[in-house]
Structures are given as structure tokens and as C-alpha cells.
């Protein structure tokens, strides 16, 4: 299954991924894109436990070391925080933080120059109001 078809409401995913796994799923989206690798929900769950065991994420899907997660799949990367108006270069990829109207906390989506590439909650089709922070 293409990763962009796997959403957080997929009941096969671990409950922690369903609730907090947006950044985790974005990293797998980029892995799928760069490595031409497809993931199914079972493989995402296995990766969740693997990366907890390696200390790259916490059980609530808080990402401790995204570079090591990508490195596991053979993607060499570095991470930095950029302000809202930053436009990535051709060899960069983005995970953008968004604030959903009337929802506590934040959500993360894969973007490229303000275009949404992958959103594990499918906010636009659900007509949810949100903004990139």
C-alpha cells in the first residue's frame, strides 16, 4: 500500500500512531518517496516498536531523532527549524507544523513550497480549518 493511503484513522495502526503519529508517518512518507519503498500498516507498526527500542522515538510517537530514523532506511539527512516563509531548495524536504482551529496541540504534514504532499489526517477533504505555523 502506498504510504499516502495510510492515514491515522487506520484501525490496523497502533493506537499511539492513530493518536499522535503524524510526524512519524511523514518520515515514512519521505522514506517511501526517496527509496521507492511501499509500507503497509503492519510494517509501520513494526517500525514503531523498532524505533522505540532504538531510542529514536517515545511510545507517544514523540520523535527524538528523526535523522537516525531516516538513516535506518539509508537516507542521510540533517534537521533544522525554519521560519514560516522559508522555501526549501531542490534537495530539501519539509515537514510543516500546522495548527488546527479549535484543537489543542499541533499536527505535522509533508509539504513542498507550501503544497501539501501528505497529510495523515486529510484535513482539507474534511474541510478542517488549519494554518501552517
Question: Where does each model-flagged region fall?
Answer:
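Helix-adjacent hinge/juxtasegments
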Residues: 49-80
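Active-site-adjacent structural segments surrounding the nucleophilic cysteine of cysteine proteases
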Residues: 1-57
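Active-site-adjacent substructure of cysteine-protease-like catalytic cores
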Residues: 76-115
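Hydrophobic, Leu/Ile/Phe/Ala-enriched alpha-helical segments that form helix-helix packing faces
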Residues: 30, 70-73, 109
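Solvent-exposed loop/turn segments at secondary-structure junctions
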Residues: 29, 100-103, 123-124
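Short coil/turn linker and secondary-structure boundary residues
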Residues: 17, 39, 61-64, 118
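Residues in well-ordered beta-strands of folded domains
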Residues: 4, 97, 118
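Noncatalytic regulatory segments and standalone regulatory/sensor domains
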Residues: 89-92, 112-133
Amino acid at each position: 500500500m502506498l504510504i499516502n493511503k495510510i492515514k491515522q484513522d487506520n484501525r490496523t495502526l497502533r493506537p499511539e500512531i492513530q493518536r499522535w503519529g503524524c510526524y512519524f508517518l511523514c518520515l515514512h512518507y519521505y522514506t517511501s518517496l526517496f527509496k521507492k519503498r511501499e509500507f503497509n500498516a503492519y510494517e509501520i507498526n513494526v517500525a514503531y516498536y523498532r524505533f522505540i527500542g532504538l531510542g529514536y522515538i517515545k511510545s507517544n510517537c514523540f520523535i527524538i531523532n528523526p535523522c537516525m530514523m531516516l538513516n535506518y532506511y539509508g537516507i542521510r539527512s540533517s534537521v533544522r527549524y525554519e521560519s514560516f516563509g522559508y522555501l526549501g531548495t531542490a534537495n530539501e524536504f519539509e515537514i510543516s507544523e500546522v495548527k488546527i482551529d479549535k484543537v489543542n496541540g499541533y499536527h505535522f504534514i509533508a509539504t513542498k513550497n507550501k503544497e501539501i504532499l501528505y497529510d495523515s489526517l486529510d484535513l482539507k477533504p474534511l474541510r478542517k480549518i488549519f494554518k501552517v505555523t
